[in-house]
Amino acid sequence: MIGIIDYGMGNIKSVANGIISARGAVKVVSDPAEISDCSSLVLPGVGAFRQAMENLSSAKFIDPIKGSVRDGMPILGVCLGMHLLAESSEEFGVTKGLGLVEGDVVTIPP
């Protein structure tokens, strides 16, 4: 079962439809306790990095996501979700990320 993390800023339906069309089983995860029902995770995202991290924090997703990935559960970040896997982002000021991927999201110089 592929869990799609629903923290209020994702393109959930598009990601779910893509997985289903590839014949994958999908569970939209809106409660961190449901992560343990999944074999892998997708972290989608549309919007600003800081707000996304605030949403993940207020929904209490950060520790369960990090723990599951550290225990070997695969995770795929889509759009903003990939940025969130990094250590930080400088979008609208430096904000700490999940730290699951080494590196920081930085602005490309003109």
Label each region the model flagged.
Residues 47-110:
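Cysteine-nucleophile active-site neighborhood
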Residues 2-24:
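N-terminal beta1-alpha1 ligand-phosphate binding loop
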Residues 15, 41, 52:
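Conserved S/T- and glycine-rich ATP-binding loop of Class I adenylate-forming
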Residues 21-28, 56-59:
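Short gly/ser/thr-rich secondary-structure transition/capping motifs
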Residues 35-45:
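Short acidic/histidine-rich motifs immediately flanking catalytic phosphotransfer sites
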Residues 26-37:
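Short acidic low-complexity segments
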Residues 25, 40, 74-76:
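Structural signature of beta-strand start/N-cap positions in the alpha/beta core
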